[in-house]
Amino acid sequence: MKFIDEAKIYVKAGDGGRGCVSFRREKYVPFGGPNGGDGGKGGDVVIVATSSHNTLLDLKYKQHHVAKHGGHGEGSNRTGRSAPDLTIPVPVGTLVMDSESGEILADLVTEGQEYIVAHGGIGGRGNARFATATNQAPRYAQSGIPGEERWIRLELKLLADVGIIGLPNVGKSTFISRVSAARPKIADYPFTTLTPHLGVVRYGDDLNTFVLADIPGLIEGAHEGVGMGIQFLRHIERTALLLHIIDISRDETSTGWHDFEVINSELASYSPELILKPQIVAVNKTDLPITREKLKDTLRIFAEKGIVLYPFSAATGEGIPALLYKIGEALKNIRYRQTEHE
């Protein structure tokens, strides 16, 4: 299934019910006063975050969402029934924006968090409300107030601790499938990962966990929409840490440094804040002879730039425990610093 992480929808809250024109009519009261009730309130349109949804696919194909109108007022001063709210479930991590202005209306990051995107109209007043000393039998009532309407844009950003980045086919999907229960489609060609994947990783004594997000491989020009484009970069904006995987086995001359620079250039072009995120850099496919032959030079080149490389093999599992431990410790330090600043 294609992953849908954006949707534009029209929402219309319910109109308020019409006020009632009515007069008291009883056997011995031929000229009773006005007793028309007020109209009921129209239903609100409410966006609700829920973990039971993980895509915006449904909203991509159902764009119009209209709440019910309030009931009309009735005689005997009976108020019309208020309409129920229309709730629209979205995945946790959804950003709600006004489609026209781009204004961020809500950032729904917790289960059950909700935001009213369109308020229902108030019911019109019945004729009983308009009776005065000089007009004891008003023959008019108010119409209900129309409900709010607007176009909104929804944008989903996956919530994960660690975002895995790298060029296509460096082994990100193989890595996440080995270390977590996630099972992304894996094949030996670029752009196998067509959708982001989340995986929960347990390490050490299995009491420590973190969440990985595997996104499609980036290529030069990704921030301008080349390849899979920038639509997936937003999913790593909320991560605390980036795991940058490189592959030096694809040709005889590659040391991984050029690839490393390409990816970081794309991150910087997309968001200056993204490039400032801490990165752990790891070189995959140490099970291949060509990688083992070139590994020493690659380690030296990165070390000269002040970067420690973590070699591993997603195919055999070699080096993965040490890499997971390093990621876990880095996350603990980041969270500790965040707690200190709160």
UniProtKB/Swiss-Prot annotation:
Q: Which residues bind Mg(2+)?
A: 173, 193
Q: Could you state a single Gene Ontology molecular function term?
A: magnesium ion binding
Q: Which GO terms describe its cellular component?
A: cytoplasm
Q: Where is the OBG-type G domain?
A: 160-332
Keyword hit for S-adenosyl-L-methionine = no
So where does GTP get bound? 166-173, 191-195, 214-217, 284-287, 313-315
Source species, domain of life: Bacteria
Family annotation (Pfam families): GTP1_OBG, MMR_HSR1
Q: Where is the Obg domain?
A: 1-159
| CDD domains in alphabetical order | Obg (cd01898)
Q: Which PANTHER family match?
A: DEVELOPMENTALLY REGULATED GTP-BINDING PROTEIN-RELATED (PTHR11702), MITOCHONDRIAL RIBOSOME-ASSOCIATED GTPASE 2 (PTHR11702:SF31)
Instruction: Name the NCBIfam families on file.
Output: Obg_CgtA (TIGR02729), PRK12296.1 (NF008954), PRK12297.1 (NF008955), PRK12299.1 (NF008956)
Similarity field:
Belongs to the TRAFAC class OBG-HflX-like GTPase superfamily. OBG GTPase family.
Q: What is this protein called?
A: GTPase Obg
